[in-house]
Amino acid sequence: MGKFLIKGGNPLKGKIKVSGAKNAALPIITAALLADTPSKLIDIPHLRDVTNLCNILEKMGAGVEFENNIVSIDPTTLTEAEADPELARKLRASYYILGVLLAKEGWARTSLPGGCNIGNRPIDLHLKGFKALGADVKLDHGIVEVKANKLKGARIYLDYPSVGATINIMLAATRAEGKTVIENAAREPEIVDLANYLTVMGAKIKGVGTDIIKIEGVDSLKGAEHRIIPDRIEAGTYMIAAALNKGDVFVDNVLAEHLKSLIAKLKEMGIQIKEEISGIKVVSNDKLKAVDVKTLPYPGFPTDLQSQIMVLLTQAEGTSLVIETVWENRFMHVDELKRMGADIKIDGHSALIKPSQLTGAEVTATDLRAGAALILAGLVAEGETEVRNINHVERGYEDIEEKLSGIGADIRKVK
């Protein structure tokens, strides 16, 4: 299982490099199966989720090579349209197989996916989209099966701008007959990145990055080479780490336009932010101001940075308010932060944070971003912090201990 041991108080200085975006890599790797020829995908992070997905595709017969952050995929050897149920349960993104193989093979089956336990995350919107395109959908004892003789374009309104549903419907629609319109679509940069890859493959997609996406189906797609965008959540995590620890850190390989909401909040707290071509320089201030944060779908403040900024707010002067509107179980890290001395009160979907002197403690990561928050808390806490269940963290952060050590953090992984 492993754990991180962290001694707090070290100022962070230097340069830290951000990896490719996991949440872009997973749908793009799966989308490579849509093509009739191989693809080469660059800047893919070495993470457990990525490895699990590659293993799923290999078991389905696809040719997959993963080394030096490059994934090469040959879809021509694909023999199965069903994902291994044990592997699929470990990975929420395994549901993208449904949209891809429904479009290409007319049939797909997988078990209901896993991932972080941060609340009710149904795939109803995905299935509603598939049905609108003409698919038959069966859900039985945790197994999802989709079938269609020929998908036909449709106008689909999403009750909520779900990232997963937007991606899955877009994947299925690329090879459907006619035009598909997705209304109230999610606008995340990872969706734009996927659409850019699909377009190079020969797909006809317009409006990505807005709430209305239009897809004109094509008969076939060809493989392509594509470089994944930087991981904005990893970048945001390191920006917050720098702000916590009297930092003077250059966060390399960041697209600042993907982090406007975080940058605005950090500046509001009194932190110096300088946007450069290849990254963002963060210089901390001894006195941080309290701010209010409300999570929203992109381009609002990301729910995936809520737990991390909550740690930063414990070091601010004054009372801060955090309102979580995206996931209902996204405060699971709070009890662990309280073990370290954090003064946080929860009321429904809101958290009230007061200034706190954090001290080292034994804490447990309950999910990916909670784990990241506990690491950040350990970096600023007095004494030693032990973070357990780090398998959650390793699902989403490539070489996090080496990267943080490189800018002065005292962090090491032990068995």
From Swiss-Prot:
Annotated active site: C116
Gene3D superfamilies per UniProt: Enolpyruvate transferase domain (3.65.10.10)
EC number: 2.5.1.7
Keywords: Cell cycle, Cell division, Cell shape, Cell wall biogenesis/degradation, Cytoplasm, Peptidoglycan synthesis, Pyruvate, Transferase
GO terms for MF: UDP-N-acetylglucosamine 1-carboxyvinyltransferase activity
Pathway it works in: Cell wall biogenesis; peptidoglycan biosynthesis
Function: Cell wall formation. Adds enolpyruvyl to UDP-N-acetylglucosamine.
Protein name as annotated: UDP-N-acetylglucosamine 1-carboxyvinyltransferase
Name of encoding gene: murA
